[in-house]
């Protein structure tokens, strides 16, 4: 029911006391960085952009959590915004259909990558992030789904795999 639809979040709790240490909302609020990507939609209506209850992944070398985030509701732009025209589409409706890299001590978003801005097709990107150590030199002509900012250097450690179709780096 519509009464159960809410703004989603990821939270960390103290393992001894159970007290919440931080909370990061998975849809940028009106006053948050990235909030303008939702247009005039009130923060309370930026819903269902969820991690689905799936676990995140942790990189101990970089001390980062990686979490996959789902689609917004309703499923089409016209239902969410009342129009198909959303202007500049990239990024759009952050942090839907994204990977979030989160600082585990503070809950701050270190970086994000949005796979499908302004999703109208219910294309979830929430599966666990598979962390790999490898050097890649991607050719965007040969690999359909690839982060165009990746470059083949040993220093680059922002490669996070989303396995399955339409998975990619």
Explain the meaning of each model-derived region.
Residues 1, 25, 70, 166:
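Short loop/turn segments immediately following the C-termini of beta-strands
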Residues 5-7:
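Extracytoplasmic
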Residues 9-42, 46, 78-125, 132-160, ...:
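Extracytoplasmic/lumenal domain signature
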Residues 49-51:
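Soluble metallo-hydrolase cores and metallopeptidase-like ectodomains found primarily
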Residues 61-62, 166:
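Short strand-connecting beta-turns/loops that link adjacent beta-strands
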């Amino acid at each position: 029911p519509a009464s159960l639809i809410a703004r989603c979040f990821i939270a960390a709790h103290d393992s001894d006391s159970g007290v919440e240490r931080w909370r990061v909302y998975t849809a940028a609020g009106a006053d948050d960085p990235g909030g303008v990507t939702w247009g005039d939609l009130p923060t309370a209506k930026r819903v269902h952009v969820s991690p689905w209850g799936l676990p995140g992944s942790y990189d101990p070398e970089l001390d980062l959590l990686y979490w996959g985030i789902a689609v917004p509701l309703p499923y089409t732009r016209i239902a969410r915004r009342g129009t198909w025209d959303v202007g500049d589409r990239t990024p759009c409706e952050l942090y839907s259909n994204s990977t979030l890299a989160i600082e585990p001590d503070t809950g701050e978003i270190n970086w994000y990558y949005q796979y499908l801005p302004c999703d109208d097709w219910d294309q979830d990107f929430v599966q666990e992030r598979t962390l790999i150590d490898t050097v890649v030199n991607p050719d965007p002509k040969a690999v359909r789904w690839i982060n165009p900012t990746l470059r083949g250097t040993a220093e680059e450690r922002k490669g996070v795999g989303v396995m399955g179709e339409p998975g990619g780096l």
